[in-house]
Amino acid sequence: ICIDLDEILLPGWRKILEQNWKEDTTRVYYTYNWKLDNNNRPLVTFYTDKIHKRNGYKWTHPVHEVLTPMIIEHKIIIKDIILNHYPDLNKSRSNYLPLLEMSVKESPNDDRNMHYLGREYMYHQKYNEAIDILIKHLNLKTATWKDERAASMRFIGRCYNYLERYDEAILWYKKAIKEAPYLRDPYVELALLYHKLNKNNKVIYYTNKALSIKNKDMTYINEIFSWD
């Protein structure tokens, strides 16, 4: 079991794990409350997977570390095991960018960290660099997860929005919608841009499209603002 210093497993996890672990189990997905409000209510929740068999795995990447299997996996989901995240909000993100750059340099065909690097450039307001890297992510043959591809497209749209290149922003938000029409996020971001541009009919249209999506998948991709 691997958790960070700013994470806490809720009581009872061991008994639940022992009751559900089978002889051929190698890895467990469980509930991760990545962000909580001041009353300890979850805001961002998804499954994570750092409970694993002792042998047959190794850790890779200098940041956003990945548990990489060297065996054939048999995974199970135990949603009643809950891990809460209590980050230090005063901690700087400045170390993430050079580590992600190092990670991508070491593994240039790793789609996951290419996506993370593009996102990190966006967070650092390096919008042109972010766009270039996110397009590289989309062009990787291994970048097949539609949710993450749509997020890269959405971040490209967001960067163009920040650069006040609104036509290109709209184009990429629409690409994100086409890639993953079952996610709220691209509809919401496009509606917000149309609100900024005072195109109210389109605000109403895309907001209603977002609200028609009721299912919130258990992945890290979901934005808080699409569901609050």
Question: Which residues does each predicted region cover?
Answer:
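Short beta-strand-to-loop acidic/aromatic patch adjacent to the donor-nucleotide binding site
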Residues: 1-10
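Catalytic-site signature of metal-activated, phosphate-bearing donor transferases
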Residues: 9-132
